[in-house]
Amino acid sequence: MLAIIVATMLVSAQQFIGVNLGYARPITQLNQPVVGQEKTLTPTPYNGFKVGLVYDATIVKGFGFSMGLNYTFAANSTDWKSEFASVYPQVSSRGYYHQIELPVDWQYKFEIAQRTWLILYTGPTLQYGLSLNEKGLRRDDKGNVTEYRDVNRYSLDKNDHLALKPLNVTWGIGAGFQYERYFLRGGYDFGLVNPYKSISFAGKDINTRGRFDQWQIKLGIYFWER
């Protein structure tokens, strides 16, 4: 019966299917296995892009939902800094982030002019990390650079203090604008789960804490409408 009701609502809904491309700023906020700092979350921002498909349906009087399938790539780097007391050697790191996302948002569209809407939305996103690679680089006083670490944090054993789970759930809130078949949407996603594989750091009486957040802004076009 419920399936029949849902199907009937979708048949009468205003529906769009399209594509979107935009800017993504994932942020890992993680604590470290250091006594006295176990409650401090250190943010590490990444900058990149996302691209994907989107389905949008307005069911009744502006209320509806939007869902999609996105791919996100982002990267970050740190400045060179001295590894020890002397100026050299210096160390730096590079990070690369690949992720698939399934957002499902409940939304309300305010029609401010003919086929022109302001949009408010909120909802969960299921994220699956394909890889989160971190490379450590070392530079000597002659400018020679060597790589001393290259790990995928999703593939590490849970006893490694860097090990993270690829599966994440966020809750987002945002706003948007649509004119005809063109749209702009932006918002912030708050991480809901601890991304560490273990509840505590191996060999230490310190619990792991953290979350994955994300800023995003997307431009898109609907190529199908009913």
Language model regions located:
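Outer-membrane beta-barrel channels and translocator barrels
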Residues: 58-62, 111-115, 180-182, 224-226
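Extracellular/periplasm-exposed beta-strand and loop segments of Gram-negative cell-envelope proteins
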Residues: 27-46, 74-100, 129-172, 192-216
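Bacterial Sec-dependent N-terminal signal peptides
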Residues: 1-20, 116, 219, 223-225
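Helix-adjacent hinge/juxtasegments
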Residues: 93-99, 106-109, 114-115
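Start-of-domain marker
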Residues: 15-66, 72
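Membrane-proximal, glycine/serine-rich, low-complexity loop/turn segments characteristic
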Residues: 14, 117-119, 123-129, 189
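Residues on the lipid-exposed face of transmembrane beta-strands in outer-membrane beta-barrel proteins
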Residues: 19-23, 49-57, 69-71, 102-108, ...
